Amino acid sequence: MAKLTVKDLDLKGKKVLVRVDFNVPLKNGVITNDNRISAALPTIKYIIEHGGRAILFSHLGRVKEEADKEGKSLAPVAKNLAEKLGQEVIFPGSTRGAELEAAIDALEDGQVLLVENTRFEDIDGKKESKNDPELGKYWASLGEGIFVNDAFGTAHRAHASNVGISANVEKAVAGFLLENEIAYIKEAVETPERPFVAILGGSKVSDKIGVIENLLEKADKVLIGGGMTYTFYKAQGIEIGNSLCEEDKLDVAKSLLEKSNGKLVLPVDSKEANAFADYTEVKVTEGEAVDTGFLGLDIGPKSIAKFDEALTGAKTVVWNGPMGVFENPDFQEGTIGVMDAIVKQPGVKSIIGGGDSAAAAINLGRADKFSWISTGGGASMELLEGKELPGLAALTEK
């Protein structure tokens, strides 16, 4: 990666501004999954072990008005991080002002301070999300010309806390997480060891058009599963019953199939039910067609076998999007089958592109078997599309 990284800097005695991604799920003030906090530890530890004074910025959820602040404070995150680091995390509870500035000025080498949720600045004119120049300049002024971006999850957005700070410091560099994310995903797509197989699931073709187009050029095979299967089916005149279908994307699906040169691999059967939630009957379709009054909610056993065969010998696999409604035990076999088919390939570099696929791997006990699980759904999708990420573009060149 031709950008400066945290290892290229002298950090001792410096106030180091760090954008992390602590956008973790909270239920009644309790963090239900702290993976993103753990993912930021290597960079934070490196800074404090090298005598830097770490000043951390993160958003949490969406905040549009005063009422949205309820339950969106980073206070529980500060507590969790302090436990993980084994030291105090100073939390003034504000995004600007005299109290925050005094706390930063009082920092000693090796100490950590967490600024309050950056999106609290969105209440007045979306200053964070719209990259307000004054806010970026103010936050940059809290440090000493050094900014470390370690938030891959927001790298596809130009916000005041990433692009805004970057524009107002002498050196904007990548943290270890950002560096790894880019290395794994970009290298997999740009210079993969072959055979390179991409697997795309999820419900909407519209979310994945750019990704499918880019990967059809780069991958040896692109396997399609999940709800978007049925838009591809209908585009070919296959009966889909009550299955999910994007009627306005039938032409796109048809054109993708036509230009795929056989690289696009679709399921050959489905697990169908007579309703999404309160169903009374679940069965496997005979072939591709879904029965009248039923909807496809997972790929079927023949499809799992077909995908297993398509993955045989693969050296690079990128997977984004589950094969079915994996949260329901009745419709998780497809996702499990595909995960198992990926991880059993000898010497495979296996990458999960964040979002629901990451949740599936974690919830279904397969996370430790993958080479890399991305922390950013939207950002990894844009990398897979071949787009440049604003948060990355704003970093200083080596």
From Swiss-Prot:
Single Gene Ontology BP annotation: glycolytic process
UniProtKB keywords: ATP-binding, Cytoplasm, Glycolysis, Kinase, Nucleotide-binding, Transferase
Subcellular localization, as worded in the UniProt entry: Cytoplasm
Source organism of the structure: Streptococcus equi subsp. equi (strain 4047)
Stored Pfam families: PGK (PF00162)
Enzyme Commission no: 2.7.2.3
GO cellular component: cytosol
Family the entry assigns: Belongs to the phosphoglycerate kinase family.
Source organism, top-level taxon: Bacteria
Subunit structure: Monomer.
Record protein name field: Phosphoglycerate kinase
Biological pathway: Carbohydrate degradation; glycolysis; pyruvate from D-glyceraldehyde 3-phosphate: step 2/5
Family matches, as HAMAP family: Phosphoglyc_kinase (MF_00145)
InterPro entries: Phosphoglycerate_kinase, Phosphoglycerate_kinase_CS, Phosphoglycerate_kinase_N, Phosphoglycerate_kinase_sf
Binding-site residues for ATP, renumbered to this chain: K208, G296, E327, G354, G355, D356, S357
Annotated substrate binding sites: D21, F22, N23, R36, H59, L60, G61, R62, R119, R157
One example GO MF annotation: phosphoglycerate kinase activity
EC class of the enzyme, as a word: transferase
